């Protein structure tokens, strides 16, 4: 299982939690309090091989050790699903029985692997059939280009082109912090994604609203204990790194079955 950790050259906002955002959603306050007490270590931190990470060369992909058994779902984590039908950074029915939350960085090579190899399978097998909803969270950890790419993704969403931009950005492996996500290339990606109003795209990228939205996503991830990308929650069950596709399929199937059982039990109790 593999993921990426920030390099030592990452900007301060990408290497440690940003300050509290006024835009943090009130609906998750109680859930995050639960997470701070229990899920932070149980959900993500214990899946990291801390010793290996300390020995690793800065900027190289972080080795991740899988748990012997799947981590259980957590009620606080379940509450993080936004289920906002108008969210342009989400795909799938808002009332889908399973929600996968993804914390990713556009410069993360393992996020790219997930986007190219696993996500298309999940879309075909579960999203298109109404079983799964995928909600994106911007989690830039590799410096200025990561942050600019996150802002660009948010701006693309303002014109309902986030997923098109996502597919272009992850369309091929790109070297980190080499200009692949500089201003000129981000505009080129926006054009390729079919974004019509480039001036609006650039203005949205530079807006305080964009920075606030990205910061709120980062804060959510940091509160969970996320330190590398990609990281996922499948109906509250944590998965860290670019696991094989069947790992995600198993998680979705298990979550869908549990949701169906819960609905049946709830209906019988009425």
Residue ranges of predicted features:
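Short clusters of hydrophobic/aromatic residues that line enzyme substrate/ligand-binding pockets
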Residues: 89-91, 181, 239
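Structural alpha/beta surface segment adjacent to cysteine/selenocysteine redox centers
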Residues: 96, 104-107, 112-191, 270
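C-terminal cap of thioredoxin/glutaredoxin-like
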Residues: 1-63, 68, 192-270
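A generic local structural motif
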Residues: 85-88, 119-121, 217-220
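Processing junctions and N-termini across compartments
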Residues: 102-105, 226
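A short beta-strand-turn-helix
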Residues: 81-98
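Short coil-to-helix leader/linker segments, especially the first N-terminal amphipathic alpha-helix
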Residues: 68-84
């Amino acid at each position: 299982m593999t993921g990426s950790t920030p390099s030592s050259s990452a900007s301060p906002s990408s290497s440690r939690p940003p300050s509290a955002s006024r835009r943090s959603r009130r609906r998750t306050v109680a859930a995050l309090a639960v997470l701070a007490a229990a899920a932070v270590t149980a959900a993500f931190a214990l899946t990291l091989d801390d010793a290996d990470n300390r020995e690793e060369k800065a900027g190289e992909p972080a080795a991740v050790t899988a748990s012997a058994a799947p981590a259980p779902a957590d009620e606080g984590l379940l509450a993080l699903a936004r289920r906002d039908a108008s969210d342009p950074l989400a795909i799938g029915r808002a009332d889908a029985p399973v929600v996968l939350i993804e914390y990713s960085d556009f410069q993360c090579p393992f996020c790219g692997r997930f986007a190219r190899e696993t996500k298309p399978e999940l879309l075909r097998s579960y999203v298109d059939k109404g079983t799964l909803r995928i909600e994106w969270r911007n989690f830039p950890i590799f410096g200025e280009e990561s942050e600019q790419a996150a802002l660009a993704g948010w701006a693309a969403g303002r014109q309902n082109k986030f997923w098109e931009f996502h597919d272009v950005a992850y369309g091929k492996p790109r070297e980190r912090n080499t200009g692949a996500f500089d201003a000129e290339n981000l505009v080129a990606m926006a054009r390729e994604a079919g974004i019509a109003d480039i001036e609006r795209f650039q203005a949205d990228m530079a807006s305080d609203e964009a920075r606030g939205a990205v910061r709120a996503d980062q804060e959510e991830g940091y509160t969970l204990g996320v330190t590398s990308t990609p990281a996922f929650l499948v109906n509250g069950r944590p998965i860290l790194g670019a696991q094989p596709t069947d790992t995600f399929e198993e998680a979705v199937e298990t979550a869908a079955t549990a949701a169906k059982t819960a609905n049946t039990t709830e209906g019988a109790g009425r």
